[in-house]
Amino acid sequence: MGQKIHPIGFRLGITQDHRSRWYADSDRYPELLQEDHRIRTFINQQLANAGIAEVRIERKADQVELQIRTARPGVVVGKGGQGIEELRKQLRQMLPANRTIKVNVVEVNRVDAEASLLAEYITQQLERRVAFRRAVRQAIQRAQRAGIEGIKVQVAGRLNGAEIARTEWTREGRVPLHTLRADIDYAYRTARTIYGILGVKVWIFKGEVLPGQTEAVPREATRRSPQRRLPQFENRSN
């Protein structure tokens, strides 16, 4: 039975960059790695309504530089920069006293072309008791209007409150997971419903990164077609 490698880890150094960029000796490496995990968890919890797509961390000596990619930079920055100052203050209390923290906020250009934001949108819909097929269909339509090349969505668990858990998925366009130069974005989220936890996985193919390029060239965003066929779901439980 074939197993799927993580699409982002598979392409590190080719089309994807590391989310954490620093060097540490072997005795300090576990400490800093756990620190990175705590920082990301804290930011995602504190800014849950800000549409956080990604948190990149760079370290230079005792300086920690954070780059927060968000769909709503105004929520992160706050009025007069108060949001960032409050975030830095809370991070200083959480981290060792000798850490200097710098926060950069970057706005996401194409919100509906980010796998993490689309997965978050689907989980929010599922937690509001929207039928999973409708939630997935709306997410796919939003992504197609953003000009992506292809998208694949998988939902697993007690779908629509069914007694027996199952896995269903659908795909629109191309999602070439075996092509290393393919710019694949991937995200996994969990939706907590009254029937239990549902797992949501989203793969987005943005295009191929050709030699000499740093990212895929986005195609023009497409308008919604009234005659577009509905996504066909497949059951992967057996």
From Swiss-Prot:
The keyword Ribonucleoprotein applies. One of its GO terms (molecular function) is mRNA binding. The keyword rRNA-binding applies. Transmembrane segments: none annotated. Keywords: Ribonucleoprotein, Ribosomal protein, RNA-binding, rRNA-binding. Residues 39-109 form the KH type-2 domain. Pfam families: KH_2 (PF07650), Ribosomal_S3_C (PF00189). GO terms for cellular component: cytosolic small ribosomal subunit. Binds the lower part of the 30S subunit head. Binds mRNA in the 70S ribosome, positioning it for translation. Belongs to the universal ribosomal protein uS3 family. HAMAP family: Ribosomal_uS3_B (MF_01309_B). This is Small ribosomal subunit protein uS3. It comes from Thermosynechococcus vestitus (strain NIES-2133 / IAM M-273 / BP-1).
